[in-house]
């Protein structure tokens, strides 16, 4: 719902008093089947209680959900040049800066579907460039999807069908604390509660294996290479599956006999899944590791069923990529400077552009966590952020906005890219959605 005070009436931001979705304040309330926006899995089975002290996760919590839902908001008001102003004035100043800019950069993009659609509309109107703060990790996937294609599974298919799960070079438990609980070792499956136990293989040493336990898990195997060598180990696995001889008797400490044993497990699997998380693959040319993971899937589909599953997707990055794709035809790093969408994954990477002095205004959206700080830059910055967002210096314009799924309703695209999940308004604070603020800025241009 559009906040009527955005363009004129005085604002009071934020109020942490409990309220209903309509804005009417109420006593404590308990919410069932709450979707969590604080990681890409968007677990939608939480129970959250709201009282006059704030929110508390009562059921199906993890560290990320507790930190996100139960965070106390500091006082925050709209600012222009570091001084408190009414919201309408901040919006008018933001519109003025965008109207004067020759090449505005729209970054951060931690928002929901509606917020991202508003970003795309404003970027098109102002001739700007769109890129998510975490797109460097996303492009480890995009480059392979664009050049060779892939075969992927979903969270539900993996949960219900997989008998072999290979975790490739990625600390999945750190990124998704409930992945093993919900997907790898759930209490039952959709098709057969007496399904045989599944084998879990970790390729990489130092990965958190503590959650790889439960009644659904049989053998847990580790091939202890450096995580950045996981692609090379999988490449050797592909070679052995194809019948090639390898001269080295080991790959980064992984014995060829262990690779051969994994090859035999892959041959016998009825439904295998290779899991990786691009944020974990933080080394040069990591897309080549992703190419090996997806190539293994293609090879094995000649004789059995195998699929990939890419994880990650924090800060609404999956949503940003999805909305950008269906709105412009391109997955982020899109320029509207010519009046039409233009795509270049190098030229329009906002991180590179800021480092090299390109662009004359940064519009930064960070509505989910307080950790997605705008990068240091000499150009004016407009920030639409959750209260408590870490800022190195006062931006030209600061507008506090709500978190989707906490302060207002919304939608986020899940990490497997097959569904957008509805987010509830839990009434934590009376903060406007980023989508409403962006629409008001566009209306004021």
What are these regions (language model features)?
Residues 1-240, 278-279, 443:
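N-terminal export/assembly segments and adjacent metallocofactor-ligating motifs
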Residues 10-11, 25, 70, 206, ...:
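Compositionally biased, intrinsically disordered low-complexity regions
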Residues 28-45, 282, 311-329:
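N-terminal, charge-rich interaction modules
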Residues 48, 298-311, 394:
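Internal hydrophobic scaffold segments of catalytic domains
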Residues 122-129, 295-303:
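Short helix-loop-beta junction
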Residues 128-148, 207, 305-332:
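Short connector loops at secondary-structure junctions
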Residues 142-301, 335-445:
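Non-catalytic alpha/beta scaffold blocks inside enzyme catalytic domains
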